[in-house]
């Protein structure tokens, strides 16, 4: 079953968190769900070059909180936070409510090459540039291994290299335990529009096992912070706190 079901859906509440965090009645639930879908579609289309991995949405009373996980936060934030205001007005226009309070948090992804969404996006871009799919997969695997992932699986399907008959090919490096629920599996799928047709891309990344507090070993000592290493950037919007 672990090889057929969606890895993220199987692990919701265990190692994966919900992308939308809010409660609603049966009457307003469909409307809010459609709003979330429109917001994600607007952000992915407007900031296609920002390397956005995920968009998390939370609702509290009349306030809407949007958290963006991106590899290039500067593209979204802009100069002196001007991009945040533009994004806020765009979200309000998308949902059709200019008076809605929108709070935006931009979080930088610390390990870009260990993110399944960004790896799938990289593979799609290379395939659309007519790079051979085997070379593209090999380069993606090397980038993920340098990022320190424990396992990786990549599958590409379609008219590979312009072949007359569509087929699927995949490769795996390291461990990818899809049946282990405590395994932190990052999964993403992407489509590449080539001159020969559409290619489907699936990426599984194994980042380790999430242990409970009872199973975790006792810390012996904190490792010193390396010189020159910087913390991941995080921009938190507090413009609506006083309203």
UniProtKB/Swiss-Prot annotation:
Tell me the CDD domains matching this sequence.
KH-II_30S_S3 (cd02412)
Concerning InterPro entries, the annotation shows: KH_dom, KH_dom-like_a/b, KH_dom_type_2, KH_sf_prok-type, Ribosomal_S3_C_sf, Ribosomal_uS3_bac-typ, Ribosomal_uS3_C, Ribosomal_uS3_CS
Ranges for region Disordered = 215-243
Q: Which family is this protein grouped under?
A: Belongs to the universal ribosomal protein uS3 family.
Which Gene3D superfamilies is this protein grouped with? 3.30.300.20, Ribosomal protein S3, C-terminal domain
The leader peptide range reads: none
Key word RNA-binding present in the record? yes
Q: Which organism is it from?
A: Prochlorococcus marinus (strain MIT 9211)
Question: What SUPFAM superfamilies does this protein map onto?
Answer: Prokaryotic type KH domain (KH-domain type II), Ribosomal protein S3 C-terminal domain
Q: Which gene encodes it?
A: rpsC
Entry-linked PANTHER family: 30S/40S RIBOSOMAL PROTEIN S3, SMALL RIBOSOMAL SUBUNIT PROTEIN US3C
The protein's role, per its UniProt record? Binds the lower part of the 30S subunit head. Binds mRNA in the 70S ribosome, positioning it for translation.
Task: Name the chain's protein.
Answer: Small ribosomal subunit protein uS3
Report if keyword RNA-binding is assigned.
yes
């Amino acid at each position: 079953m672990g090889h057929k079901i969606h890895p993220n859906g199987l692990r919701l509440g265990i190692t994966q968190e919900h992308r939308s965090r809010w409660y609603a009645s049966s009457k307003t639930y469909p409307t809010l769900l459609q709003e979330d879908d429109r917001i994600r579609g607007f952000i992915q289309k407007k900031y296609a070059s920002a390397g956005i991995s995920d968009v998390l949405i939370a609702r509290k009373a009349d306030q809407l909180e949007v958290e963006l996980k991106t590899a290039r936060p500067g593209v979204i934030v802009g100069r002196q936070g001007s991009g945040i205001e533009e994004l806020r007005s765009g979200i309000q226009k998308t949902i059709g409510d200019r008076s809605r309070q929108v709070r935006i948090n931009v979080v930088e992804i610390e390990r870009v090459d260990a993110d399944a969404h960004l790896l799938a996006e990289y593979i799609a871009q290379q395939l659309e540039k007519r790079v051979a799919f085997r070379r593209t997969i090999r380069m993606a695997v090397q980038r993920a291994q340098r990022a320190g992932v424990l396992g990786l699986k990549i599958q590409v399907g379609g008219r590979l290299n312009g072949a007359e008959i569509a087929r699927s090919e995949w490769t795996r490096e390291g461990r990818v335990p899809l049946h282990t629920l405590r395994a932190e599996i990052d999964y993403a799928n992407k489509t590449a529009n080539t001159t020969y047709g559409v290619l489907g891309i699936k990426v599984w990344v194994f980042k380790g096992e999430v242990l409970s507090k009872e199973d975790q070993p006792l810390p012996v000592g904190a490792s010193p912070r390396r010189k020159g290493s910087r913390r991941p950037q995080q921009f938190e919007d507090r413009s609506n706190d006083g309203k």
